[in-house]
């Protein structure tokens, strides 16, 4: 995906206007927006019996967690180095629900004296959710295409502080927990800016999000796709 987006950006360069777009007329900018997040499945691989998040698992369990789409609210604070390069801090609040767990190899999970037994090749509905606050900092490149339209490409690193709560699985509280964590996060994004005035423009972006949230002998890291629209002001 990154290679394809890079090729698209490079191939657009011959058509880049030499005149500044409205959106690069001032150094500082702030933005506020919202969008949706589409989490990827998270693999489960519990090779040995153990306890994670206060839940005791039997060994040999494999499967995946599935999630519903959720929402994001985000803010931007940036500074333009020149006509094409900015450095930006993105603050975000994200929330989405668990959908279900798909077990490939079953086993047991015990929490609070209650044991959940999951069968192989079976799916169970989950009552639970994840909410997160994130901060990402990094460079943004933008390329003028028309007088008030430009493409952007960027990314950054930072952290995500999140609450991960499962209330029940398949109606059982045997796999229930409520944990707070803070982990390394990164984001790649691309999109476009459309200027309304010299101080105001609309930004639409696609983002690929990564959180180093994997737990040894339990789950892999978290990744997700996001689609956002922001109203941005220069000053």
Task: Label every model-predicted segment.
Residues 1-26:
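Cleavable N-terminal export/targeting peptides
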Residues 184, 191-193, 200-209, 225-235:
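Outer membrane beta-barrel transmembrane domains
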Residues 20-28, 34-42, 71-168, 194, ...:
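Gram-negative (and chloroplast) outer-membrane scaffold detector with strong preference
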Residues 44, 165-172, 214-217:
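Short acidic, glycine/proline-rich loop/turn micro-motifs
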């Amino acid at each position: 995906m990154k290679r394809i987006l890079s090729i698209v950006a490079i191939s657009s360069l011959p058509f880049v206007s030499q005149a500044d777009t409205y959106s690069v007329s001032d150094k500082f900018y702030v933005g506020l927006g919202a969008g949706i997040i589409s989490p990827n499945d998270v693999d489960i691989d519990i090779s040995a019996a153990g306890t994670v998040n206060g839940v005791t698992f039997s060994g040999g369990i494999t499967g995946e967690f599935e999630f519903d789409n959720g929402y994001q609210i985000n803010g931007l604070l940036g500074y333009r180095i020149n006509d094409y390069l900015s450095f930006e801090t993105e603050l975000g609040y994200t929330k989405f629900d668990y959908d279900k767990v798909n077990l490939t190899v079953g086993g047991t999970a015990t929490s609070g004296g209650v044991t959940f037994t999951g069968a192989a090749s079976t799916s169970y509905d989950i009552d639970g959710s994840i909410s997160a606050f994130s901060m990402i900092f990094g460079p943004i490149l933008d390329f003028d295409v028309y007088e008030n339209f430009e493409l952007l490409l960027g990314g950054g690193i930072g952290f995500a502080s999140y609450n991960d709560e499962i209330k029940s699985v398949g109606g059982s509280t045997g796999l229930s927990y409520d944990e707070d964590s803070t982990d390394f996060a990164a984001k790649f994004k691309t999109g476009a800016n459309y200027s309304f005035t010299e101080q105001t423009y609309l930004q639409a972006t696609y983002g690929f999000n990564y959180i180093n949230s994997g737990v040894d002998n339990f789950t892999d890291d978290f990744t997700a796709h996001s689609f956002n629209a922001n109203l941005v002001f220069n000053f």
